[in-house]
């Protein structure tokens, strides 16, 4: 199992994306065509793996304007995608020169064996950061050229340790992978690193986002700003809750005012929570926030009677 394996990812999907996915039920997502020319240089082919966390399915992108083009991501290995990509390439007289993978998760890499089976010349042209199994490495800043398209790689960990975005220079656009989705928010392995990657993506100035899931992002900079603001507000709420508890406990002669994650969730969201919402979504998400805040030096924990209890290091807020 690779670092941040599927157990963690599936758990994380329930964590940081949970509130957003409740608001964006799958049935209410806009319909995307199986194959759609999004711009003169970008052709999207849906992965045929629609689901709660894959949205309309994994977007695979054929990039370029000439006969020879590259593809970004390969879907989940669904036979219907294999048939669709094969017929699309055949009908458009397109051949593939490179396969670029945004990261290692199976809904992005699962189609690689089928591509190699159909097009054996690609066996030495599969590119991924932290490469394995005969793949070629991608270096931060590496540039891939095909007719009509210059694609520059940007290492952007957070959703996964090996996550890459790709900038399409001719369009001032970015293939955002799973760091930024077309709908809702992404699951992350390390919240602080993901937020730093979003700031890096923001600094590129790319206006349009081609996400790995969901519709085209017309204003990528605004979407990223909204993601960062949302996470900052959630962090601030955790800090306020810990600070308030510390003041209340200090008034009773208890110095740290530490709380378990369960107590923190109850203080923030009340006692009437559904058990599954609490254990599968809110508690793991708050754990991720606390981990980031600990890395920032804002909070720490103590272990009492076998329980990890969190407390604020400095009461930085006087909010009630």
Swiss-Prot record:
The reaction(s) this protein catalyses: atrochrysone carboxyl-[ACP] + H2O = atrochrysone carboxylate + holo-[ACP] + H(+)
Gene3D superfamilies: Ribonuclease Z/Hydroxyacylglutathione hydrolase-like, Winged helix-like DNA-binding domain superfamily/Winged helix DNA-binding domain
EC number per UniProt: 3.1.2.-
InterPro entries in the record: LACTB2-like_MBL-fold, Metallo-B-lactamas, RibonucZ/Hydroxyglut_hydro, Sec-metab_biosynth-thioest, WH-like_DNA-bd_sf
Listed cofactors: Zn(2+)
Co-factor binding details: Binds 2 Zn(2+) ions per subunit.
Binding locations of Zn(2+) 1: 103, 105
TM region(s), chain numbering: none
List of catalytic residues: 107 (proton donor/acceptor)
Name of the protein: Atrochrysone carboxyl ACP thioesterase
Species in which this protein is naturally found: Aspergillus terreus (strain NIH 2624 / FGSC A1156)
């Amino acid at each position: 199992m690779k670092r941040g394996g599927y157990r963690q990812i599936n758990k994380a999907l329930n964590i940081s994306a949970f509130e957003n996915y409740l608001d964006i039920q799958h049935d209410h997502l806009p319909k995307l065509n199986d194959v759609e020319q999004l711009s003169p240089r970008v052709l999207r082919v849906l992965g045929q793996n629609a689901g709660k966390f894959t949205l309309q399915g994994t977007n695979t992108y054929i990039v370029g304007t000439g006969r020879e083009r590259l593809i970004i991501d390969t879907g989940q290995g669904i036979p219907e995608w294999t048939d669709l990509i094969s017929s699309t390439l055949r009908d458009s007289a397109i051949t593939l020169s490179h396969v670029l993978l945004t990261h290692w998760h199976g809904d992005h890499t699962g189609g690689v064996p089928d591509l190699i089976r159909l097009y054996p010349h690609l066996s030495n042209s599969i590119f991924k950061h932290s490469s394995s199994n005969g793949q070629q490495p991608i270096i931060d800043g590496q540039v891939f050229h095909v007719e009509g398209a210059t694609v520059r790689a940007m290492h952007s960990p957070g959703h996964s340790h090996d996550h890459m975005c790709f900038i399409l220079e001719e369009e001032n656009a970015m293939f955002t992978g799973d760091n930024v989705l077309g709908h809702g928010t992404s699951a992350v392995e390390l919240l602080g690193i993901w937020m730093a990657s979003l700031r890096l993506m923001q600094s590129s100035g790319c206006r349009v986002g081609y996400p790995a899931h969901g519709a085209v992002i017309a204003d990528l900079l605004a979407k990223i700003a909204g993601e960062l603001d949302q996470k900052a507000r959630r962090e601030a709420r955790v800090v306020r809750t810990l600070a308030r508890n510390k003041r209340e406990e200090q008034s009773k002669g208890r110095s740290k005012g530490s709380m378990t994650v369960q107590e923190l969730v109850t203080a923030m969201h009340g006692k009437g929570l559904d058990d599954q919402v609490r254990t599968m979504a809110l508690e793991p998400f708050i754990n991720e926030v606390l981990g980031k805040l600990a890395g920032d030096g804002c909070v720490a924990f103590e272990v009492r009677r076998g329980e990890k209890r969190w407390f604020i290091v400095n009461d930085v807020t006087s909010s009630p």
